[in-house]
């Protein structure tokens, strides 16, 4: 069996306390972007979740550099996947003795960076 040289690294952030819809806005924004450009965009993004996405991206870059020896200047974000995690169900009291359910969503984030050749 011939082992292929791996030129991608991954990182994940699990059980992030934000809805998948809000997290996917930021993940879709950085998808297919160069890592250096994505870090700048996430640093100055007004979204609160951008800090968590930036930390996960920096972890993926560190994995690529330390574990695989990839060049960080040529890294591109090839995948930024968002998934549903658990849902905490809470009760909110309402008028006339009723109660409604509040759902507090959690998300998972998976980022894959790949080394691209300069063209």
UniProtKB/Swiss-Prot annotation:
A Pfam family hit: Ribosomal_L22
Taxonomic path: Bacteria, Pseudomonadati, Pseudomonadota, Alphaproteobacteria, Rickettsiales
Assembly with partners or alone: Part of the 50S ribosomal subunit.
Keywords: Ribonucleoprotein, Ribosomal protein, RNA-binding, rRNA-binding
Keyword match RNA-binding: yes
Protein role: This protein binds specifically to 23S rRNA; its binding is stimulated by other ribosomal proteins, e.g. L4, L17, and L20. It is important during the early stages of 50S assembly. It makes multiple contacts with different domains of the 23S rRNA in the assembled 50S subunit and ribosome.
Gene Ontology terms for molecular function: rRNA binding; structural constituent of ribosome
Entry keyword annotation includes Ribosomal protein: yes
Family: Belongs to the universal ribosomal protein uL22 family.
GO cellular component, one term: cytosolic large ribosomal subunit
Protein name: Large ribosomal subunit protein uL22
A Gene Ontology biological process term: translation
């Amino acid at each position: 069996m011939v082992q292929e040289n791996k030129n991608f690294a991954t990182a994940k952030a699990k059980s992030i306390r934000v809805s998948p819809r809000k997290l996917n806005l930021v993940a879709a924004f950085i998808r297919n972007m160069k890592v250096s450009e994505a870090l700048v965009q996430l640093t100055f993004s007004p979204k609160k979740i951008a800090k968590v996405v930036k930390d996960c991206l920096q972890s993926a870059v560190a994995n690529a550099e330390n574990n695989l020896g990839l060049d960080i200047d040529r890294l591109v974000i090839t995948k930024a996947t968002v998934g549903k995690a658990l849902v905490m169900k809470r009760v909110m009291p309402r008028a006339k003795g009723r109660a409604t359910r509040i759902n507090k969503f959690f998300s998972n984030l998976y980022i894959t960076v790949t080394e691209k050749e300069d063209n």
